[in-house]
């Protein structure tokens, strides 16, 4: 019996992925800020006081309520980037998957077998979409700078920064970003598909229940974060530099190995698995559950 999934409409994919992105940013933006600040920190943290200073920066001595509000820098950029990213990734991957199914299904099936071939097409489609995600890089750069290096903004808005710095500078690190996204998205969608195929035994992935989507999203998210961790550290350090003090990815790799050792490339992995992991699982499972439901509503 052929392993085929029911197709959803483009509008359903747009609504489902956008809803997942909006709900994710509302819940997880402060967590993302903490993770980015830990990854950008070059010193060893040996006490709770030092951790407090790294996370809250100049506001570390203020009351807890005020400190918590400082974890929402760059929310406008973050919201714009996250919603567009989720729409592009979660809504776009099915289109890439359909393209591969239409033109290369036989090749994948001959190479990997029918069941594994289906999962590999899903992974390959995710990788293609992940590489194309660099078009959104300027918003990601501004989001990270607002989270980790807010003084580089100096009161400037988006248009002023674009005029002052030039669009090219906002695409700084695009090669490293593509190199990170390709295996990361491959592992995300591939892990998700393999879990549905081999652990859950689903024939039509779109018919997965919320709990099944949750389980498969855990597998995909953990695989993605582990695979992309080293390149994610490099990408983050490229992007959080001052606009007037850029540093190449190769120089960052060299200096990191020299000053911090190879384990530095996995800095922030544990908090990222504990923080970004649930965030990615949440939005991925939500998008996979909402898209078929929106499709059913729109088809009535």
Curated annotation (Swiss-Prot):
Q: Which GO terms describe its molecular function?
A: guanine nucleotide transmembrane transporter activity
GO CC terms in record: mitochondrial inner membrane; mitochondrion
One GO biological process this protein is involved in is: mitochondrial genome maintenance
Report the membrane topology from the UniProt record.
Multi-pass membrane protein
Q: Which keywords annotate this record?
A: Membrane, Mitochondrion, Mitochondrion inner membrane, Repeat, Transmembrane, Transmembrane helix, Transport
Keyword presence, Membrane = yes
Q: Where in the cell is it found?
A: Mitochondrion inner membrane
The answer to whether UniProt assigns keyword Transmembrane helix to this entry is yes
What family, per the record? Belongs to the mitochondrial carrier (TC 2.A.29) family.
Protein name according to UniProt: Mitochondrial GTP/GDP carrier protein 1
Q: Which organism is it from?
A: Saccharomyces cerevisiae (strain ATCC 204508 / S288c)
Q: What is the lineage of its organism?
A: Eukaryota, Fungi, Dikarya, Ascomycota, Saccharomycotina
């Amino acid at each position: 019996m052929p392993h085929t999934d029911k197709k959803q409409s483009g509008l359903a994919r747009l609504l489902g992925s956008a809803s997942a992105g909006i709900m994710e940013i509302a819940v997880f933006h402060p967590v993302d800020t903490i993770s980015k600040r830990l990854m950008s920190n070059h010193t060893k943290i040996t006490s709770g006081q030092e951790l407090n200073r790294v996370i809250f920066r100049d506001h570390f001595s203020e009351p807890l309520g005020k400190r918590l509000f400082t974890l929402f820098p760059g929310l406008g950029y973050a919201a714009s980037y996250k919603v567009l990213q989720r729409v592009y990734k979660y809504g776009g991957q099915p289109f890439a998957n359909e393209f591969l199914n239409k033109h290369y299904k036989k090749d994948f099936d001959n190479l990997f077998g029918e069941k594994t071939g289906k999962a590999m097409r899903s992974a390959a489609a995710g990788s293609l979409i992940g590489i194309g995600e660099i078009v959104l890089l300027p918003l990601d750069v501004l989001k990270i700078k607002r989270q980790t290096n807010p003084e580089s903004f100096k009161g400037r808005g988006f248009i002023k920064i674009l005029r002052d710095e030039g669009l090219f500078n906002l695409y700084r690190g695009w090669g490293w970003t593509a190199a990170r996204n390709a295996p990361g998205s491959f592992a995300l969608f591939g892990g998700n598909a393999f879990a549905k195929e081999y652990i859950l035994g689903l024939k039509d992935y779109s018919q997965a229940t919320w709990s099944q989507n949750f389980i498969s999203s855990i597998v995909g998210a953990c695989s993605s974060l582990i695979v992309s961790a080293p390149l994610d550290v490099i990408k983050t350090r490229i992007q959080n530099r001052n606009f007037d003090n850029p540093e190449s990815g190769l120089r960052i790799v060299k200096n990191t190995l020299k000053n911090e050792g190879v384990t530095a490339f996995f800095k922030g992995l544990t908090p990222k698995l504990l923080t970004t992991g649930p965030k990615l699982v949440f939005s991925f499972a939500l998008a996979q559950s909402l898209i078929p439901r929106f499709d059913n509503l729109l088809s009535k």
